[in-house]
Structures are given as structure tokens and as C-alpha cells.
Regions:
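Alpha-helical transmembrane segments and their membrane-interface boundaries
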Residues: 2-137, 141-300, 304-352
Length: 352
């Protein structure tokens, strides 16, 4: 494996190489490559998001985050269907992420619920045909981030321009990297494989219904940062209940640990560098291969932003409440939903 090829590995792949190193020299080399990868990734991400903020305005910095996330994920990940169809679908997904979150923010919670369900139905059914690719962690997360950081007026016009450019970049990178791959499915096949007896379809329906419902309840209860609860629910919903229970435990414990660590840093560090706590969290996520540790470090960035608006106490309270509510509601909802669907139609295992 070349130096460049090793740089392309994810955290789990890099840590596997480290674990299986036979000599100290080999382990030091893999450690060096891993640290270079983290450094290069952080510098690139920081530069990309900073540039997008300068061009599109500070209110649209989240556009840079969403576009960067899509490019980095879909340069390797696929949708499981023909490349040409997938490319058009990616363009459609960007349209949905640009229009629907903004439209939902203009409506009261109940009409917004319907908009969110319709939008997530397209993203999940066509973008997340293989649950184990975890494309929902890109598409639904991107949707929720844009929903949570909505803008209006001139800023929204700039957001449209930024998302259009992001769609073009993502589609070009995706097509270039996947054009020579063969896929058996097309868009019609994806629709035909929708089956209420399959574990995949049940999981998709849980995502489509539960996440918007969590957002709606959070809004009806006047809970700020409703997107946090939605993101927590999305992250916890998996095809199998045993996996969900594990995720829920790790999410709750990870967020509480993250809140404690953030609070310690908040009091130890001078106010002038509070904004950089989020970068520390980003580095931590890059070094983490396990979901529990990722939950810890993901808390840093969210709290660094929220603390500016709500203060430390308010941000910490919101983070814990929203995350516990999101994952617990998702667990209960999916347990009931899976039970009802299993009674109506026996589980059918499928090849994804």
C-alpha cells in the first residue's frame, strides 16, 4: 500500500493497520501517516469552510460544512444504483436540502412536519438504499443542519448559489470516481424493492417518520435547537433493535461526557480561544473510530456555537435535554413501529 493509498483509509482502516503492525518501525510509520492524514484533513476542512463563509457570508458557513461533507463522503460512497441515475439524484438531493428546510421554517410545526416527511422520504428511499453505507449520516444530517441554521433575504439567495455550486462539485467528483463501476439497480428497481416485510424498508420508514416527528414535538414544546434532537434521533435509528439500544446508550453517555469535558475546557481556557474548542472536537472526531468517542467530541463544536447565544449553562442544558429526548423517543418509536410492522408482515431479509 502506497503512502497516498493509506491516506485514503478511514479511521477504522488506519487503526487496523496500527493494531496489526508487526514491528515498532512499521507502527511508527502507520502512526505518522495517520497523523498526517488528520492534519491535512483538518487544514483542508478549515480552509474550505472559512472560504465559503467569506464568499457566502458568516450566516451561510453551514453551507460549506454540508458541501464539504457531501464531497468527502460521495467521492467513495455510492447510492447502490447506476452512476448516471445516482448523479442526477445527488443534484435533486441538493435541491431538496436547499428548498425544503427553508420552506419548513416558514410554516407552523404541523405543516412543516409534512414538508420534512416528504423531503426525507426522497433522501432516504433513493439515497439510503443500503443502510450499512450510512448515507443518512450525510444526507439527513445535511438537511437538518440547513434546517437549524436557516437564513432569509439576501443570505438565502447566497445560500442558493452556494448549494448550486456545491451540487456541481459533488456531482462531478462522484461521477468521476464512480463512472466505471457497474451497478445492477436503477431508480425503477429501487422503487420495486420497497417492501414492508423487509428490514430495510422498515428502517427507512422509521427514519422518514420519526426524525420529522421529533423536530415537530421539539418545536411545539418551544425547545431551541430542535435540530439537535433530530440529529440524535437520526443517528440512533438502525435496522436492528440491539444495535439501536447500543447507540442510544453510547449517545447519552458520550454527550454527557462531552458536556463535562467542554465545561472543563471552557473554564480553563481564556475566552479568546473559545471558538477553537470546536476545532479540538473536530480533531477528536478524526482520531475516533468508535461511535461513543465520536459522540463525545461532536459535542464540542455544537456547544461552542450554542454557548455564544445561550451562555454555557443554557447551551449545556439544551444539549443534554435535546439529545436524551431525541434518542429515547427514537428508540421507543422504532420499537413500537417494528413490532407493529412485524405483526402485519414477517421480516424478510434482503441483500443490500
Amino acid at each position: 500500500m502506497t503512502f497516498y493509498q493509506e491516506l485514503q483509509l478511514n479511521q477504522a482502516g488506519s487503526k487496523s493497520l496500527l493494531k496489526n503492525s508487526k514491528t515498532m518501525k512499521e507502527k511508527l510509520y502507520h502512526t505518522f501517516v495517520y497523523m498526517v492524514k488528520i492534519a491535512v484533513t483538518m487544514v483542508f476542512c478549515f480552509a474550505f469552510v472559512t472560504a465559503s463563509s467569506i464568499i457566502l457570508g458568516k450566516d451561510n458557513s453551514i453551507v460549506g460544512v454540508v458541501v464539504l461533507l457531501c464531497v468527502m463522503v460521495f467521492r467513495n460512497a455510492d447510492l447502490g444504483i447506476h452512476t448516471r441515475h445516482s448523479t442526477w439524484l445527488l443534484a435533486l438531493f441538493f435541491v431538496i436540502m436547499t428548498v425544503c428546510p427553508h420552506l419548513a421554517n416558514q410554516l407552523s410545526p404541523l405543516p412543516a412536519l409534512l414538508i420534512n416527511i416528504a423531503a426525507l422520504a426522497v433522501l432516504i428511499l433513493f439515497g439510503c438504499h443500503n443502510p450499512f453505507m450510512f448515507n443518512q449520516s450525510t444526507l439527513v444530517l445535511g438537511y437538518l443542519l440547513l434546517y437549524g441554521y436557516d437564513v432569509s433575504g439576501k443570505s438565502y439567495m447566497l445560500r442558493i448559489a452556494g448549494m448550486a455550486a456545491g451540487a456541481a462539485i459533488t456531482c462531478l467528483v462522484f461521477y468521476r470516481n464512480h463512472k466505471n463501476r457497474d451497478y445492477k439497480r436503477n431508480m425503477k428497481a429501487v422503487i420495486q424493492e420497497f417492501d414492508l416485510s423487509s428490514s430495510r424498508t422498515k428502517w427507512q420508514l422509521c427514519q422518514i417518520l420519526c426524525v420529522p416527528l421529533v423536530l415537530c414535538i421539539a418545536q411545539l414544546c418551544n425547545m431551541p435547537r430542535a435540530m439537535w434532537a433530530g440529529i440524535a434521533a437520526m443517528s440512533a435509528i438502525l435496522p436492528f433493535m440491539e444495535d439501536m439500544q447500543y447507540r442510544v446508550r453510547k449517545r447519552i453517555v458520550g454527550n454527557i461526557a462531552g458536556v463535562i469535558c467542554f465545561t472543563v475546557l471552557y473554564f480553563l481556557l481564556p475566552p479568546s480561544i473559545y471558538a477553537y474548542i470546536g476545532i479540538i472536537g473536530g480533531i477528536g472526531v478524526g482520531l475516533s473510530a468508535q461511535y461513543g468517542w465520536q459522540a463525545v467530541f461532536n459535542t464540542f463544536g455544537a456547544l461552542a456555537i450554542a454557548a455564544e447565544s445561550y451562555g454555557l449553562k443554557g447551551a449545556v442544558s439544551l444539549r443534554v435535554i435535546q439529545n436524551v429526548f431525541g434518542v429515547v423517543f427514537a428508540l421507543v418509536f422504532c420499537a413500537v413501529f417494528y413490532r407493529i410492522m412485524s405483526v402485519k408482515a414477517p421480516v424478510k431479509e434482503e441483500t443490500v
